[in-house]
From Swiss-Prot:
One of its GO terms (molecular function) is rRNA binding. The gene is rpsQ. Belongs to the universal ribosomal protein uS17 family. This is Small ribosomal subunit protein uS17. One of the primary rRNA binding proteins, it binds specifically to the 5'-end of 16S ribosomal RNA. Part of the 30S ribosomal subunit. One of its GO terms (biological process) is translation. It comes from the Bacteria.
């Protein structure tokens, strides 16, 4: 797979408890087929962070790569901005 054809995403870090792995949540907006309203869906990805630079609340850019483990198929490109940890703790938690 060519490097330029790989998918890239922007998301917010919700967990950095694993070694060299972060959990990033990405919000995706889809249009409801019947009513036409935009509905927000979120999806979590496990992302490889070799230098362990990303912290909870950071906005990060990551890309698709070869499978690194059973659940990890993305790697961190760069940290776009630093956010507050308390914001993510409350808004990023799902049941």
């Amino acid at each position: 797979m060519k490097r330029n054809s790989r998918k890239t995403f922007v998301g917010k870090v919700v967990s950095d408890k694993m070694q060299k792995t972060i959990t990033v949540v990405v919000d995706i907006y889809k249009k409801d087929p019947l009513y036409g309203k935009r509905v927000r869906q979120s999806k979590k990805f496990h992302v490889h962070d070799e230098e362990q630079v990303a912290k909870i609340g950071n906005l990060v850019n990551f890309m698709e790569t070869r499978p690194l483990s059973k659940t990890k198929k993305f790697r961190l490109l760069k940290v776009l901005s630093h956010g507050k940890e308390s914001e993510v703790r409350h808004s990023g938690e799902t049941k």
